[in-house]
């Protein structure tokens, strides 16, 4: 009974604020989302359609260490803030209005935030975080070739069992820090220039667009996987994705000695460099990395000039990686 009273006291201000809105028609779109199954529903809006104007405030108002789900609805707009989903804020579901219509933007860099891992616009440490139809952007200027400390992370995800559906990730160098944990990305748009998906997560990317904005006369890179030891179960897998852009990229480079990256049934445009992969200046990693391609197609998928340590995988070899079982998704998705 005490919990029930506390819960009512938390949600009643939201209801009372919504009732005071003078122009309810402009806010109808926020009332069309199904809320069944959520213990709490919080609304964020720059236009007076919710209790909060900042996403961080809504996250802070959610119940900590909860076994039930909280829904955070984020209205149209550009939210110029940096927010953190702390470790005790689990089971959050964040719903935007479309990744081209709802975005979180900040502009830190490695230099301005004392390290690449701290340069994020958004960081997720809590478990079972889910985001729909929202963009995460780092708007720091594109670095010149050879620039030092210009890395700029849009999203850092550390919490286990995180999923992103129809989301956008925008930056230049080091856009998406897929640091650790099991993660699922479905129908997302990911843009960057160098190492724009990096970290040591165990993650499946399905039906995503990977868009290179590397500068002309340079070679960018999509992935920099951080698998450090043979026993790690981590790696990045891309299934039914599309690689586009305006300048050449490698599929991956060996940030750590046991880097593991697989592309399956992915369209590769001409932006993919003919050699495909890079050892990051350390030939020893050629014996330990696991770089695989499986049934990929398009002008960038020609394997005839690939580096010798890249693998063309058979259906049997690819099978352990190309479905949600790679991330134990049948247990949590």
Curated annotation (Swiss-Prot):
Main subcellular location of this protein, as a coarse class: secreted
Function description: Acts in the modification of cell walls via demethylesterification of cell wall pectin.
UniProt binding sites for substrate: 116, 151, 253
Similarity field: Belongs to the pectinesterase family.
Annotated EC: 3.1.1.11
Domain of life: Eukaryota
Pfam families tied to this protein: Pectinesterase
Free-text tissue specificity from the UniProt record: Expressed in flower buds.
Entry keyword annotation includes Cell membrane: no
Annotated site residues (Transition state stabilizer) in this chain: 173
This protein's UniProt keywords: Aspartyl esterase, Cell wall, Cell wall biogenesis/degradation, Glycoprotein, Hydrolase, Secreted, Signal
Name used for this protein in its record: Putative pectinesterase 14
Glycosylation sites (chain numbering): 108, 114, 133, 302, 323
InterPro entries documented for this protein: Pectin_lyas_fold, Pectin_lyase_fold/virulence, Pectinesterase_Asp_AS, Pectinesterase_cat
Pathway(s) this gene product operates in, as recorded in its UniProt entry: Glycan metabolism; pectin degradation; 2-dehydro-3-deoxy-D-gluconate from pectin: step 1/5
